[in-house]
Amino acid sequence: MPCHNQQLNNNSESPEHAAKHVRFAQSSAAAAETCQNDAEQPEYQTTSEIHQQIGPQLKLLPLNDQIRELQTIIRDKTTSRGDFVFCADRLIRLVVEEGLNQLPYSECTVTTPTGHKYEGVKFEKGNCGVSIMRSGEAMEQGLRDCCRSIRIGKILIQSDEETQKAKVYYAKFPPDISRRKVLLMYPILSTGNTVIEAVRVLTEHGLQAKHIILLSLFSTPHGARSIVQEFPDITILTTEVHAVAPTHFGQRYFGTD
């Protein structure tokens, strides 16, 4: 458990580091020009452009080679299911750890086994998780591995066959959820419609959007932008913003592909 409440600072990053934060199909200027000439390739956008469009509500895990490799394995169509689940669980754990770092802490003093006083911090009470079924359930174990006693609610949202709009079929939350900080778990943000409906249900239960931290692994610019436009006070934490989201995640993780 971290002993500090570190905030991600995406505005002060160097151009070189920023270029590694958000990656699209092509990363060089020449490749970006190629993308514009090829309608099948996603358009290149820089980190600063994404943050101007979406705002500070979007927080990215600092990119390193470990995260980049996990992203690559998850996206690779030749990856076995065993390796897929293993790498997905590792990436989920990293996202959950940083999500916990966004929750409020309070200072405390403890006594060490040698009798010395130590000034530290501890979580403030009143946190819970909510998974959007089914793919969001893949993130539950990662949260429980970090917070053994945390309460987790569930919500099931599917597209209506006639209207194609997101429809809530099941929702169960802790009775006092309106007073809690919520880690909302949904690994892939594609259109953002499912998350928007889930947040709408949570706000109908009295929860303020500013108390919701959305944990995801991958997001499209459109998905993140749509969510922030609908709920400007929400926080979105993800590892990558890319024009193409690995929408096969749920099927691969649960072995139904």
Swiss-Prot record:
User: Where is GTP bound in this sequence?
Assistant: 81, 90, 124-127, 151, 180
Provide the binding site for 5-phospho-alpha-D-ribose 1-diphosphate.
134, 186-194
Cellular component annotations (GO), alphabetically ordered: cytoplasm; nucleus
GO MF entries: GTP binding
User: CDD domains under this entry?
Assistant: PRTases_typeI (cd06223)
Q: Does the keyword GTP-binding apply?
A: yes
Its subcellular locations are: Cytoplasm; Nucleus
Record's protein name: Uracil phosphoribosyltransferase homolog
Protein encoded by which gene: uprt
